[in-house]
Amino acid sequence: MIVQRLLNQLIAQDIRDFRVLAAIAKVPRQLFVDEAMAHKAWDNTALPIGHGQTISQPYMVARMTELLIQNDPAHVLEIGTGSGYQTAVLAHLVEHVYTVERIKSLQFQARRRLRQLDLHNVSAKHGNGWLGWPNKGPFDAILVTAAASEVPTALTDQLADGGRLVLPVGDSQQTLQLIERSGSQLTSRILEPVRFVPLIDGDVE
């Protein structure tokens, strides 16, 4: 079974949260890639989705999701909808996902896929991810799916008390970071080296 093979690989890579594994099993990744790539959809690898963007490797989706949901967040902000795959995984795990995408055509396609899967606990908008979604915050958790050159202040400002921000940071050398808010204090942990497309300031029609 192709899905089980991927789950076994994720378990071997130390993904332990059964909720994350169950969500990944439920989301048909082939719907989120080009038809020509559908045969690779359940491979544990990143794939191109056009516009210089990618659908992240399932391991990285699982790893970031596992970090994000440790405190059982209800309202989550995702920066970089992309194909909508990570959005769909989150939608199986939290009460509501707010997601922002700077490339309008990607955002349109992602919305269509999420509707097709009857995932109605998602609010999506076209906009500049560096700015977050201030009038919907604060958020219990924020996930960024592209590498910011530095941690965006607008995002830490939109993090609720006890909230978590998971994001890749850096230019040529990138690291996955976990930032947690306790009152007015922010603590940051560097977790592992990663490779993501850059988080670009601005939006595109």
Swiss-Prot record:
Belongs to the methyltransferase superfamily. L-isoaspartyl/D-aspartyl protein methyltransferase family. GO terms for molecular function: protein-L-isoaspartate (D-aspartate) O-methyltransferase activity. It catalyses: [protein]-L-isoaspartate + S-adenosyl-L-methionine = [protein]-L-isoaspartate alpha-methyl ester + S-adenosyl-L-homocysteine. Its EC number is 2.1.1.77. It comes from the Bacteria. It holds the Pfam family PCMT. CDD domains: AdoMet_MTases. Keywords: Cytoplasm, Methyltransferase, S-adenosyl-L-methionine, Transferase. It is found in: Cytoplasm. The gene is pcm. The lineage of its organism: Bacteria, Pseudomonadati, Pseudomonadota, Gammaproteobacteria, Aeromonadales. It comes from Aeromonas hydrophila subsp. hydrophila (strain ATCC 7966 / DSM 30187 / BCRC 13018 / CCUG 14551 / JCM 1027 / KCTC 2358 / NCIMB 9240 / NCTC 8049). This is Protein-L-isoaspartate O-methyltransferase. It is an enzyme of class 2 (transferase). InterPro entries: PCMT, SAM-dependent_MTases_sf. Signal peptide: none annotated. The keyword Zinc does not apply. GO terms for cellular component: cytoplasm. Its main location: cytoplasm. GO terms for biological process: methylation; protein modification process; protein repair. Catalyzes the methyl esterification of L-isoaspartyl residues in peptides and proteins that result from spontaneous decomposition of normal L-aspartyl and L-asparaginyl residues. It plays a role in the repair and/or degradation of damaged proteins. The active site is at S56.
